[in-house]
Amino acid sequence: MGKIVRISGPVVVAEDIENAKMYDVVKVGEMGLIGEIIRIEGNRSTIQVYEDTAGIRPDEKVENTMRPLSVELGPGLLKSIYDGIQRPLDVIKETSGDFIARGLNPPPLDRKKEWDFVPAVKKNDIVYPGQVIGTVQETSLITHRIIVPDGVSGKIKSIYEGKRTVEDVVCTISTEHGDVDVNLMTTWPVRKARRVVRKLPPEIPLVTGQRVIDALFPVAKGGTAAVPGPFGSGKCVSGETPVYLADGKTIKIKDLYSSERKKEDNIVEAGSGEEIIHLKDPIQIYSYVDGTIVRSRSRLLYKGKSSYLVRIETIGGRSVSVTPVHKLFVLTEKGIEEVMASNLKVGDMIAAVAESESEARDCGMSEECVMEAEVYTSLEATFDRVKSIAYEKGDFDVYDLSVPEYGRNFIGGEGLLVLHNTVIQHQLAKWSDANIVVYIGCGERGNEMTEILTTFPELKDPVSGQPLMDRTVLIANTSNMPVAAREASIYTGITIAEYYRDMGYDVALMADSTSRWAEALREISGRLEEMPGEEGYPAYLGRRISEFYERSGRARLVSPEDRFGSITVIGAVSPPGGDISEPVSQNTLRVTRVFWALDASLANRRHFPSINWLNSYSLYTEDLRHWYDENVAKDWGSLRSQAMDILQRESELQEVAQLVGYDAMPEKEKSILDVARIIREDFLQQSAFDEIDSYCSLRKQYLMLKAIMELNSYQSMAIDHGVTMDNLSSLPVREKLSRMKIVPEDQVESYYSSIIKEIHKEYTSFIGEKNAEANI
């Protein structure tokens, strides 16, 4: 039995630990806190503790469990929510309430639940490592395959059928070295990668249904991708702001917050100057979504601090005080745009709810512009003109409602304005063709993790209609949890992903965010008094990041039959200030082969997914070209290249247009700008809230891109024959092309054919049939 000699935050030094080995799990102090040995010098062992060490004293005991940090693998992983060291959060809530009591270590898998085991082999059969000996229907979507452990082969001595718990023996195998019992559950050390026969080249794409990803920047199954995710931007309102509830009543947001805070069923999470209330019963409100006002709900209330507020008053008597970065919907001649409060001007038209049926038409804009913006709804949306804008300085309490599924806004303010709110969308988890999703919330703020924990269980798998959680494992490790557990959460998640890969499944693992993991490494390194590297990160940062990403890949698995599986790792990095030149981003980009550059300016223009096509890249494009040619179309690669060339050319021509003016540009260059706009708005832009547009099959993507390139070809031909863009820009087929994204999958082939015919008909009316045929 060892004893503590030194404590430094999450790092504890103990001496005389019995049989101490690197990465052994130990129980620290009288409370039995879980820790891991990370350094041994003589009789002294350095331990990183995965729980808060407050109150631990020198000379308290340290007990060695004689085993490395491991995870339990078996039926019951799916639909579970764990912390960084695989403690089930739902079980902990029942045991200790809303906060995790120290020293608690409940089993990750339910020991009492019985699973219906169906054997796939029979007595006296010869089995080999990796062979499937039976199955369990884990969820409605996933069949859990029980396989022979690695290194075990022999004859089946006995096998059972029917109801079994995870600890029950389902099979006994006679080997050269004695009998080996196989349970439904096994354990595996998290730092050790599970063995495969060989890694395979990345030749099959992970289809996401997002056009900008699948068409321009694809990721392969078994590939690696990096996504920069900047910190939140604090879009809040003052406490005096009324919120319009679905029952027709209004209540000040500070009073709403106070009343919900008093309810015992709600969970209050407090941080430095911030509080978040996790609501058991969601608040029913209204939101503005795609031009209509709909009933919505919020499960999160936020309270924070701000030194400045912007007071906005309108001609119609409406008013609201918001933080400078808060966005409002502004009606312009081009449509509806989101504008930060600090950028609003007197005279701007901001979205509101009409107080009378006639007010929607009496908002000072032309009827054509209002109709184009689609502001008529059952609640009569309108726009009100800003009369005055004033800045207020002081120490203000500010509040927010989180409304992730309903346009990220709510109706509130004096006179009912549309108030913005933001949250990350998880389209990849919902739509990618991976069988299993493992989501690791590594050091993210509590309110962001709560969004995920409350949103995921309510999402439906779009293919099967079953709950998305039926194929998902969530690992929640918030920023106020001990930093050491952040590192463990990354390894816990990748080990669970490897387990399902070994069954032959395609797994998508999302780590959000690896920057927080790196910050944990930096803090532990500092406590260990190691020589710091760049920006204080340890010198081995690059090696740790590469070791994690190297566990991805598509592989031929250990099995007597041909079985293949893959792990696709998508890691979010959160560089301070969005600076991707810092060490974590650079080391991540060095080992990942896809980079999706999120662009705040695109998000501000309501262009989603807001992936910048000029700064993003995919090194899998050439590897996947053969698959696309064989499974989609022979000219897929050339269409992609044409689209990328046009977008690249547009960025160059925009600088020229700003210097000389659009009207002074040659018609050819006007045409390039025009086609690039069509690609951006009608192809790359995609609505996550539209039932049809939220997912786009590869075939539909191909036909959309083919139609745009066909239009580009005819347009270029027409300009060669002296036709101007003024004549071409008003052709009816262009509007039909813009609607192609909302055409159902079963109608897209006929719709494409009609578009091609109309393009030929309308453009040849300018240049003549013979000229068109000659040029084609």
Curated annotation (Swiss-Prot):
GO terms for cellular component: plasma membrane. Pfam families: ATP-synt_ab, ATP-synt_ab_N, ATP-synt_ab_Xtn, ATP-synt_VA_C, Intein_splicing. GO terms for biological process: intein-mediated protein splicing; proton motive force-driven plasma membrane ATP synthesis. One of its GO terms (molecular function) is proton-transporting ATP synthase activity, rotational mechanism. Keywords: ATP synthesis, ATP-binding, Autocatalytic cleavage, Cell membrane, Hydrogen ion transport, Ion transport, Membrane, Nucleotide-binding, Protein splicing, Translocase, Transport. Its main location: membrane. Its EC number is 7.1.2.2. CDD domains: ATP-synt_V_A-type_alpha_C, ATP-synt_V_A-type_alpha_N, Hint, V_A-ATPase_A. PROSITE patterns: ATPASE_ALPHA_BETA, INTEIN_C_TER, INTEIN_N_TER. This protein undergoes a protein self splicing that involves a post-translational excision of the VDE intervening region (intein) followed by peptide ligation. It is found in: Cell membrane. Has multiple subunits with at least A(3), B(3), C, D, E, F, H, I and proteolipid K(x). Belongs to the ATPase alpha/beta chains family. This is A-type ATP synthase subunit A. It comes from Thermoplasma volcanium (strain ATCC 51530 / DSM 4299 / JCM 9571 / NBRC 15438 / GSS1). The gene is atpA.
